[in-house]
Amino acid sequence: MQEPAITPEVIENHGLKPDEYDLILEIIGREPTFTELGIFSAMWNEHCSYKSSKKWLRTLPTSGPQVICGPGENAGIVDIGDGDAVVFKMESHNHPSYIEPYQGAATGVGGILRDVFTMGARPIASMNSLSFGEPAHHKTRQLVNGVVEGVGGYGNCFGVPCVGGEVRFHPAYNGNCLVNAFAAGLVKTDMIFYSAASGVGMPVVYLGAKTGRDGVGGATMASAEFDDTIEEKRPTVQVGDPFTEKRLMEATLELMQTGAVISIQDMGAAGLTCSAVEMGDKGGLGVRLDLEKVPQREENMTAYEMMLSESQERMLMVLKPELEAEAKAVFEKWDLDFAIVGETIAEDRFLIMHNGEVKADLPLSKLSSSAPEYDRPWIEVEAPAALTDADVPTIDPIDGLKALISSPNYAGKQWVYEQYDTTVMGDTARRPGLGGGMVRVHGTDKKLAFTSDVTPRYVKANPVEGGKQAVAEAYRNLCAVGAKPLATTDNLNFGNPEKPEIMGQFVGALKGIGEAVSALDMPIVSGNVSLYNETDGQAILPTPTIGAVGLVAAGEEPILGEARDGHVLLLVGETIGHLGQSALLHEVFNREDGDAPAVDLEIEKRNGEFIRNNRDFIKACTDISDGGLALAAFELAEAAGVGVQIDASDTPTLFGEDQARYLVACNFDQAEALMIAAGQAGVPLETVGKFTGDTVKMGGSEATLEELSQIFRTSFAEAVA
């Protein structure tokens, strides 16, 4: 079959700029074949090369005494003691989920799970951070239902508990939803596997499901803006099979026990191309592939299609040749394909053969580590003016609370997480619903806590403070359950980086994130960048999602209790009443003005340590973020089924979103001891109310807990289900 001619239109359709194509001509000294053009397109797009973000990603703190493996591998790895490690990462599947919600979300879950078990870890927890357009938008309901069903359909069948996440709505996501999937797994520190190939002449083995035409060009599609041709992109969305993935995991983990694996890589974005190139490049080797040996489920597939297919549930491995028979037997037992499709070579070449013909012969290193890198122009985002006294609204406290909990942004998300299996594997210690999730480390007394956080309104208004706040809120959510924060993964979702104002958001957010993870000892060990989240020139809110992991060590107790009638309600931290960019302004007054709240990282660290160090006095705890004191107190009361009385009455005190604050419930006879401890630690602590009865009282306003709970538990489904 004759390959298509290389024309300017073909080059543009592959997402390559004219200067990038000129660079290809310079590198290889000739016109590329169609297959070679596809390979360059896949490896040089934003999704695989990070060409617009790499400069700034290097500024992030990624190391620490607890870090075993930082960015650059399939996932990050952190030591949790006793020969155990946690492996985790967050990654986006935004563009596919907007085009085909169910499969886009499902394969996003599948991809992140493969990243974890490729390292030798058994997945133990998942989360997802979802962003959709306004509820009334004509696509939102379809997207919400499809994405949630896809996340649940894949994760439930695979058998990993969903322990947390977030769901938000904003008109800026009308044209681009965000689906950020997180997974974590456990591995013994002496059984970690990496992707760098080693040894010349070693067999390159294809593992898992067969290759089809689904997902061809998916990575390139994920690196471009949307326009009115979006429906034509549907064939670029992958199709997942969670039962095959489950078998692939079991076979892979069993294979690793044999000692046959030299290196291993999952096939994700750009499929066979990216996995082979990354393995070779990290090992300083070349790779030769014979495509007629690739297991195929469709007839007459071309070299181009096989190299760029993103069919799911596939892996690539470099194998010890003397253990081939043993390795093959493992995969045959699990009814999965096992095929030697090539070998490592000494030369820096990526050589692709198909039926005896050379389809690609390229310098391998130029496809990966030497790919183009841009220093995009950027404009520093000028923070808006702070609210003046005249700008600050007032509202009846209960009316304000009702407005918040009737919005799908702040209503209970039961409709979402009840579709997910949250307890499979039997180690879930805290299910989704309030703050961080938690799982027990099986066979030990240790527990791992997980959270996912970002407030995009803050990041748009003030990227530096918004970036800090995303990390700080993750830190607080871990401290609030008694876990010591260990490390983070970032999922950086932004618009078109070729626009200086968008690049300015990115640069500012990374500056804030970097400062925060350094100050709070939470290095970034893995992550993902998703750019070009725009439709017809309209960008999403900048959404740098932070996933974080914390540890409750053996011998420590987590803070997982509930408030009880008679408990005192105490507020940790200083209240100023900052309403700029607040949930109240947005949901009630349709305003997004004022600056984002300032984040003092020293105070964040001090207050978080105070919570962890005084866990014996604390019966229940939550951090204060969106919705301020009022929403946090209601959520504690609603979770416990007991009323709450709050002494404050003014709007800024009740709904302000000052940072570094927590609400804690404690016994009346222990409140004084907690006050003394706070004084010794230099931490502001004040009594702001008590848990009692069956009503929620704020100032002179009140409503029954039953009425408010009904609103809280039904509003989400009524809006979007």
Swiss-Prot record:
Keyword ATP-binding tagged: yes
Q: What's its catalytic activity?
A: N(2)-formyl-N(1)-(5-phospho-beta-D-ribosyl)glycinamide + L-glutamine + ATP + H2O = 2-formamido-N(1)-(5-O-phospho-beta-D-ribosyl)acetamidine + L-glutamate + ADP + phosphate + H(+)
Residues annotated to bind ATP: Y50, K89, D490, G527
**Keyword Nucleotide-binding on entry:** yes
| Keyword annotations from UniProtKB, A to Z | ATP-binding, Cytoplasm, Ligase, Magnesium, Metal-binding, Nucleotide-binding, Purine biosynthesis
Active site residues according to the UniProt entry: H47, H93 (proton acceptor)
Query: So, what pathway does this thing act in?
Result: Purine metabolism; IMP biosynthesis via de novo pathway; 5-amino-1-(5-phospho-D-ribosyl)imidazole from N(2)-formyl-N(1)-(5-phospho-D-ribosyl)glycinamide: step 1/2
Q: Which residues make up the binding site for Mg(2+) 2? A: D115, D266
EC number(s) reported in the record: 6.3.5.3
Q: Give the chief site where it resides.
A: cytoplasm
Question: Which Gene Ontology CC terms are recorded?
Answer: cytoplasm
The Gene Ontology biological process terms listed for this entry are:
'de novo' IMP biosynthetic process
The protein's role, per its UniProt record: Part of the phosphoribosylformylglycinamidine synthase complex involved in the purines biosynthetic pathway. Catalyzes the ATP-dependent conversion of formylglycinamide ribonucleotide (FGAR) and glutamine to yield formylglycinamidine ribonucleotide (FGAM) and glutamate. The FGAM synthase complex is composed of three subunits. PurQ produces an ammonia molecule by converting glutamine to glutamate. PurL transfers the ammonia molecule to FGAR to form FGAM in an ATP-dependent manner.
Name the NCBIfam families on file. FGAM_synth_II, PRK01213.1
Q: Which family does it belong to?
A: Belongs to the FGAMS family.
Q: What is this protein called?
A: Phosphoribosylformylglycinamidine synthase subunit PurL
UniProt organism field? Ruegeria sp. (strain TM1040)
Q: Which gene encodes it?
A: purL
